Amino acid sequence: MAESLLSLAEAIAALKAGRFVLVHDDKTRENEIDMVIAAEHVKPYHIATMRKDAGGLVCLAIANYITSKLGLVYMHDIIADMGKVNPIFLKLTEGRTTYGDKPSFSIAINHRSTYTGVTDQDRALTIYKMAEVCKNIDNGGVEQFARNFRAPGHVPILIASKRLLHDRMGHTELCVYLTQLADLIPAIAICEMMDSATHKALSVDAAQEYASKFGIPLIDASELKANAKAA
């Protein structure tokens, strides 16, 4: 338990300092490691590192109360609604994922001052500026969002469940919960870690080696779940 508390404390300190944290969800779920960093600290070199060392999709996970105020909805609901016009879209949303629940994807955005939106610089700007929207959500943030962003774009937004870990144990909820523990804006950039040798998700052992090499805290979902229960 002491080791878990130390690991959690290290992860919180790293996020506060604008450094990466690696988050493992659960071997019975996706069993994947995400490289994450608080949105308010994102710089272009962070996106470059996520792109090169993680290799998955760079997304922005945001707390539910913020996405609700912005009027954002889950992509699977948008697609299902399109099924009223074209029944094929209803088929696309049938069933659940192999790991058990629906994805947390919403729309993908670009900041209006970006060019293509996909470069490290552009994605970092979009994420950082979206963190400002989240910070100002009750003070002009909604208008700021509508005025300064466009969709579709290159930064997918992930909507966290309302009660976070009490509703869902995905990386979206785990990472937004981590921002709350760190007293940061509840918006966090996340990217799955891939293995170019096996062409699968990076194993926990390989992630531990990477974390040790670069001095990055690696935290497991069980530690966050235990903390949430104790709170």
What are these regions (language model features)?
Residues 1-231:
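Catalytic domains of riboflavin
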